[in-house]
Amino acid sequence: MSNIRQEMPVLARHEGDWIGTYTLVDLEGKILDKHESHLSCQFPDNSLDSYYQINRYKWSDGKQEEHKFPGMYRDKTLWFDTERIQGKAWEVDNSTLILWFSYKTAPAMYLYEMIQISPDNNHRARTWQWFKNHQIYQRTLIQEQRLS
């Protein structure tokens, strides 16, 4: 049995809670949406190959959302297949993860996310590039700091 923590050490550095801000912009940089986030990245004790992430979002108008993303590790890749998304994440160097996913309700749309973690493991910078029919149409910029 392979161990996700050993074979994806950059991903393992993300374990814990993160707070930050998501800023959605159009191609000209105009802000379309902005909200606060609290993400929990977990490696459940009952399996060497499991990953579990909870994303909580809060907008200034009081709107809130929570989404759960269980993942399974295989071949140095983290795979997601939930009722909402399908996708995969992999490491590209000692501080960078790439995530590709698509929403099951919008098959012509997908995104690539680049996730950078700081050397001290306390800050993350993330960028989503959104594509529809293989053409970029918006970006999400995310800045986070470790809560725990």
Over which residues does each language-model region extend?
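Amphipathic/hydrophobic helical signal segments and adjacent flexible N-terminal regions
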Residues: 1-68, 132, 136-148
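Sparse, context-dependent recognition of short Cys/His-centered cofactor- or disulfide-binding micro-motifs
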Residues: 3, 24-26, 82-84, 100-102, ...
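Surface-exposed coil/turn segments at beta-strand junctions on protein surfaces, enriched
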Residues: 11-13, 92, 119
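Central antiparallel beta-sheet cores of small beta-barrel/beta-sandwich binding domains
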Residues: 32-112
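Glycine-rich, aromatic-bearing surface loops/beta-hairpins
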Residues: 103, 107-148
